[in-house]
């Protein structure tokens, strides 16, 4: 979850996962990323991480100091970009976030725009969502639009995931646990050299587990 400061990122994470993250109207209220597991409507598990709020013309030195905090964005499969619909310049805030994402090397990560605070500015949130194809208008504080958001995340994640087969040695329970944690296990079979697991995984997970992927498996 990324976005300009005070866009409602922590509130959204709390609404989706009961994470108990501090949600305040002040600069850098969130400094360390909080990650929580969430099951999408189709049953697929995902990991959601909150990040520090971005601001315009963030000094390069400050970007460097926050790089470890922001690094989670560079390894994500999808960026849920939360935008404050009550802002006087929401498009400028979107551009500011994109600038920081480019600077930290996350500009290539697929993005889902989420126009928040529809409870306070319903017409503006709806207008922004109409003008940005594939985006969603929500009110994280009240829960309005959350069901649609979850379905949209599920659709986007399915579009960037693949079913792969992995052969994991029996002494690598940590790898088996990671597959269950990061993806959706379709089937398992015990073989002489290890457990063959067929699972739906995002591209980043496939990369991390590449040593166990069975090439050419159907």
Residue ranges and their predicted role:
Residues 41, 84-86, 141:
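Residue-level recognition of the GNAT/N-acetyltransferase active site
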Residues 30, 34, 60-72, 82-106, ...:
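Conserved catalytic-core segment of NTP-binding enzymes
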Residues 77-84, 133-137:
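Short, flexible active-site loops
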Residues 1-14, 18, 88-92, 99-218:
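C-terminal-of-GTPase-core extension/linker across diverse P-loop GTPases
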Residues 48, 82, 114:
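Generic enzyme active-site microenvironment
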Residues 1-79:
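Conserved G1/Walker A P-loop phosphate-binding module
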């Amino acid at each position: 979850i990324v976005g300009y400061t005070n866009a409602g990122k922590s509130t959204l994470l709390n609404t989706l996962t009961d994470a108990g993250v501090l949600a305040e109207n002040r600069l850098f209220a969130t400094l360390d990323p909080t990650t929580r597991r969430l099951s999408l409507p189709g049953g697929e598990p995902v990991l959601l991480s909150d990040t520090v709020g971005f601001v315009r013309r963030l000094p390069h030195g400050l970007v460097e100091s926050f790089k470890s905090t922001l690094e989670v964005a560079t390894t994500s499969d999808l960026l849920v970009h939360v935008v404050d619909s009550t802002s006087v310049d929401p498009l400028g805030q979107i551009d500011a976030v994109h600038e920081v994402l480019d600077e930290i090397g996350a500009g290539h990560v697929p993005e889902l725009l989420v126009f928040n605070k529809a409870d306070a500015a319903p017409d503006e949130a709806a207008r922004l969502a109409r003008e940005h194809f594939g985006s969603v208008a929500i009110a994280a504080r009240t829960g309005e639009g959350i069901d649609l958001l979850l379905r949209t995340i599920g659709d986007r994640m399915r579009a960037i995931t693949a079913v792969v087969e992995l052969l994991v040695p029996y002494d690598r329970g940590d790898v088996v646990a990671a597959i269950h944690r990061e993806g959706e296990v379709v089937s398992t079979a015990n073989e002489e050299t290890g457990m063959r697991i067929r699972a739906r995984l995002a591209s980043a997970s496939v990369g991390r587990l590449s040593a166990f992927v069975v090439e050419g498996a159907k």
